[in-house]
Amino acid sequence: TSGFTTNIKEITDADPMTGNNEYKNLKEFYVSESGHARLFTATKYGKRFMLKCLKKDFLYIPVYQQALSKEFEIGLQLEHPNICHTIELEQVDGLGTTIVMEYVDGDNLQTLIDRQQITPSLAEKIVCQLMDALEYMHNKQIIHRDLKPSNIMVTHNGQNVKIIDFGLSDSDSFYVLKTPAGTSGYIAPEQLLPGAKSEARADIYSLGCVINDIANVTNSNKLKKMAALCTTRDTNLRPQSINELRSHSFSSSRYIIATIILAIYCLIMAGIIVATYYNRSKQAAEEETGIQTQNGDSNKWNDNKIVDYQQW
């Protein structure tokens, strides 16, 4: 159970075609061609929401009802600025059991890629925010399993990332739909092998595929190198975590900052060495001058003494 829903089974066992009728302006937003879900936009009390429910052919099939409940429970655990916020699980009139989510006003990343509308600065921002979101999820032992451009929203206001669609996500707490999941072109190759386990490295592979798509738009060598590392087929050579990925020089602007700091440090050290050498040289010169002066005075004294003696 969750803080919002007292009994999920009670909701999923209810008549799928009856329920909350407070949602207005219901509009179909997306219907999965090969999957079991459909999306609607709707308003309630003047606020816009995204509703996710089962297609009519799957409304009464227990395994898909379980899958929807699983997605809700996983989504409810995630509170991060770069992850679409899951709000409630309700019975909505005409839709059945429905996940209520925040409405994201923006475009999915695939649209921006197709339109070539990604600048170098936006590309860096998207990659950094994706890493932040995945690191947060992985720290909670949750794997997305279907990261791809169409599951990543970029808001119109601020151009911030929002990861969506946790229908294939996996957590240690759930055992529904444990079969390999993902999309061709983005799924890690090891996930297609018998007995494959969901691991952070699989998400990192998918992240690399997404980064490569972005790099092809911006022609960024740094992002291409990053994508190549993430998509290494040998899982032992692939970064084991987002934190490890960050440690590589190309992973973020911290490399540039570190380089600048190192350069400043080298300049300071060079200045200290030059100043020390100058001071020592100056001191040695002064000491040598002093010795010469003393010798000169001594010679003068001796000369005077000889003269005086002769006079005497």
What function would you assign to each model-found segment?
Residues 52-57:
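Conserved beta3-strand ATP-binding lysine motif
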Residues 58-77:
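AlphaC helix of the eukaryotic protein kinase fold
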Residues 85-97:
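Short beta-strand micro-motifs within the conserved protein kinase catalytic domain, predominantly
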Residues 94-108, 112:
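Conserved short submotifs of the Hanks-type protein kinase catalytic core
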Residues 126-127:
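Activation segment signature within eukaryotic-like protein kinase domains
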Residues 132-142:
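Protein kinase catalytic-loop region centered on the HRD/HxD motif
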Residues 177-190:
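Conserved activation segment of eukaryotic-like protein kinases, specifically the C-terminal portion
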